[in-house]
Amino acid sequence: MSGAEGNTNKRTFRAVFRTLIILITLTILALSAAILYEVTHTSNGSESNNQVFDPTDTLNAITGNIKSMIALLNQILYNAAIALPLKIDSTESVLLAAIKDLQFSNPASQNCSSGGNLLNDALYINGINQYLLSNSFAGTVGLGPLLNIPSFIPSATAPGGCTRIPSFSLTKTHWCYSHNVILAGCADSKASNQYLAMGIVEQSSADFPFFRTMRTLYLSDGINRKSCSIVAIPGGCALYCYVATKTEQEDYAATTPSELRLTFYYYNETLVERTLTIPNVTGNWATLNPAVGSGVYHLGYLAFPVYGGLIQNSAAWNSQFGSYFLPQNPAVQCSGSAEQQINTAKGSYVVNWFSGRLIQSAVLVCPLSDQLTDQCRVVLFNNSETMMGAEGRLYTIGGDLYYYQRSSSWWTASLLYKINTDFSQGLPPLIEAQWVPTYLVPRPGAQPCSAGNFCPANCITGVYADVWPMNNPFPAGSSGVNPNYLFGGAFLWADVARVNPTFYMASATQYKNTTGFPNSNQKAAYTSTTCFQNTGSKKIYCLFIIEMGSSLMGEFQIVPFLREVIIT
């Protein structure tokens, strides 16, 4: 079942449930009124004959009827709110496991893609894209040793080769992965090809998961795709890239964005590629780049994180210019007046290095059906709630939508936001985001925005290092941030240089566990983390994908690391 279908079923179930409760309540009221009328009518007759009336028996009768109705209502509530959802989840797992065992299905989907083979092990289906710890969790978390899994990520095979910019998306059914293959050196503007793979999570005989590759695609057609972002969709993968023909600085200086491409690759090896023409891009954006991290398939839409430069005095520029987000670290006192800090924060969105463009984050939203890419739209984040535009990632966890934003500006700690926009009501004018306060996991960067800086400045630096929420930072009914909120990932624990990749589990203010490599000078770059659970054994695992510096084959090699999260 896709994420969109699951959400639709849940909304339908809630609507039926609410209607049922209203009908039961009205029935109780009607019965109570009828009983009261009958009792009153009977009592009037008795008074006329006997002139004596004792209301105790009447009240006892009414109370007994109401108690029995309340007991029935409580049973209905329990069955509808607890027992039935658990039964549905159990039935879903059984059905998906049965489909996997049969290993075939009718090619009834529009892309004729058989879905029977492309299905994760039943042990993991319901442990993917879920909160993995309770909101009240007060135990300890650690990370086990590295688990020896076969790598699903190919590396460079020549000293001058390079693999960069990994993007990984995992859903209940399968995973999708992509990276850039640079033929000579690691410069972003160099000619390159794009590698794409899809596969499933399986259980190994050693009692931990591994990632089995089912299909691969090597896009080697002379088109220089860059900064690609991937999404796992029903039956396959969707890949969004921009086509690089000049340097990054030249892109921002231009007034027409580079070509954008959306590629669909299905399990039956159907390949469809579209060139995007987006109505609200030309005239507003100098350049519009995929944000590297994976997107999501949400409520029938493909949603990719994007960022780029808004042209001065364009409609989009005017709607965002002057807006600013100013998070504060309670442990850090910044110099200057509040007004000076506000003015600096406002100015941090406009970068002279990039021709004075306003660097903006946004989401590219496309309906998936029939690959209707002419209906794609770009929706801006509200800059009063997010930092300067940067690379990022979208997640769906426990039905909630999240956005990781690379800390490319002056705030050096990790940046995660909960998206509060309801896409079921159509595309919004702006995306509303709620910052998840955290003050740890800094990234290295150039001065004055090296690791540990929390005061406004004008910078564009840092490195991509997304995070994974282990439980809900904003539980339902809570008025603030969950004090037990935990998250995990991998980051480069250094002030300036891109070195010392380190695995961690942390709260907003405290590292719960950190584990690095023997050599703290180990070169590294981008890191991406995805955590999931074996619902049979209840064991939690995190997959850390890290660009590791290489002295043998190319400047960087992308390596997948798997660790168990140890709960005590």
UniProtKB/Swiss-Prot annotation:
Gene Ontology cellular component terms for the protein in this record: host cell plasma membrane; membrane; viral envelope; virion membrane
Region entry Involved in neuraminidase activity, spans: 224-229
Recorded catalytic activity of this chain's protein: Hydrolysis of alpha-(2->3)-, alpha-(2->6)-, alpha-(2->8)- glycosidic linkages of terminal sialic acid residues in oligosaccharides, glycoproteins, glycolipids, colominic acid and synthetic substrates
Cystine residue pairs: 162-186, 176-237, 228-241, 334-455, 366-376, 449-459, 531-542
Transmembrane segments: 19-39
Name the UniProt record assigns to this protein: Hemagglutinin-neuraminidase
Listed Pfam families: HN (PF00423)
GO biological process, one term: symbiont entry into host cell
Reported function: Attaches the virus to sialic acid-containing cell receptors and thereby initiating infection. Binding of HN protein to the receptor induces a conformational change that allows the F protein to trigger virion/cell membranes fusion. Neuraminidase activity ensures the efficient spread of the virus by dissociating the mature virions from the neuraminic acid containing glycoproteins.
Main subcellular location of this protein, as a coarse class: virion
Keyword Membrane: yes
Domain text: The C-terminus (head domain) is involved in binding the cellular receptor.
Molecular-function GO term, any one: host cell surface receptor binding
Keywords: Disulfide bond, Glycoprotein, Hemagglutinin, Host cell membrane, Host membrane, Host-virus interaction, Hydrolase, Membrane, Signal-anchor, Transmembrane, Transmembrane helix, Viral attachment to host cell, Viral envelope protein, Virion, Virus entry into host cell
Provenance organism: Simian virus 41
